[in-house]
Design a protein with these regions (language model features):
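Active-site-proximal beta-alpha core segment in soluble small-molecule metabolic enzymes
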Residues: 1-111
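Active-site loop/helix belt of alpha/beta enzymes
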Residues: 59, 65-177
Length: 177
């Protein structure tokens, strides 16, 4: 969809489905930049193996769970550190950094609750990025975003990218929360 509309820098903002890797690697050759998300050792190994087999670089973010509990690694956990190390050491992977989504902000009932999620969202990835950098791992990007949290946040320190999905349209659903 986005590639057909001539978008040239695309992030698949959900952890990669391993069965779709061949299709995704093909698509990556049609745009200027295509970034995948991973949150498991199997995903890192599978993306790395396909990149090697195809002699095609893969741009990959590590998905971080900032409290939503749906996907991503728990920041500062041994598992999270291991995956970041695997990504940074993989020969054919360009480790893009950390990405999170405060999806639980959609369950909030007021601005104060949303603001608390916004703080949690930012601190989860910024703190983890700092810990990785302390270990010598380069973390180029720190990406956050949900429309509700972007509407109330006043501190983006340490963040390099925001992705407030439907912020530009701000539909009735957004206005309701």
């Amino acid at each position: 969809f986005f590639g057909a509309a001539d978008f040239r820098d695309i992030t698949l903002a959900v952890p990669v489905s391993l069965g779709r890797l061949p299709e995704l690697f093909d698509f990556a050759q049609q745009v200027d930049a295509f970034h995948l998300l991973v949150d498991s050792e199997l995903a890192v190994s599978s993306v790395s193996a396909m990149a090697v087999d195809r002699a095609q670089r893969a741009s990959v973010f590590l998905k971080v769970d900032c409290g939503y509990g749906r996907a991503g690694v728990v920041p500062n956990s041994p598992h999270a550190f291991r995956l970041a190390e695997m990504l940074s050491e993989a020969e054919w992977i360009d480790f893009r950094g950390l990405l999170t989504h405060g999806g639980h902000s959609y369950d909030c009932k007021n601005r104060d609750e949303i603001r608390a999620v916004a703080v949690q969202e930012r601190l989860a990835v910024v703190g983890f990025a700092d810990a990785l950098r302390h270990r010598g791992i380069v973390v180029p990007e720190v990406s956050i975003g949900s429309t509700p949290t972007m509407c109330v946040t006043d501190d983006l320190s340490g963040v390099t990218e925001i992705r407030p999905g439907n912020y530009v349209l701000f539909d009735q659903f957004q206005a309701a929360i």
